[in-house]
């Protein structure tokens, strides 16, 4: 009987230890993800849409403008990685978590493409990306804790706002910048699909002033990231 008790205690201790290891592993995995995202070490799983494209000759001013726009988009993808990871961390259902992680995987492609394009334009990502990441992760956690309907609602609203600003960037890009345009067109199509999928799976409409606050924070990010 005593040996049985000892055996059960040992078994329970092992389970507790394994759970702790799992939590620790998850924390380290998320920290590694944050470092890779902000340091530009995220590989793309899909081919770069601009791989076969060639730019026309651009003036220095046009190159600077394209670089500013692509830096904004790169920072937006840094925020998307943090946001979706935070939301997935506390998602109530496995289905919602799977949707968020799948979207994050496609957004990682966007991140890698924007990073590559910035290098081609002889520019660099925003110096404030670590701060954007931390803030977005915290927002993702907060959205996720409200439940899956609000979680998916946040995805839908985020993607719709990103879709709108990508449309603006496509209009603003120099006509000669064909490679950036090819990237943004695929990104825009992906964002539309992510929003539609969230809406089909029970996304709730976010009440005011949440969408307005999201738009305000996005404007601040874009103003800073365009320059720094």
Name these PLM-found stretches.
Residues 16-228:
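Non-heme di-metal
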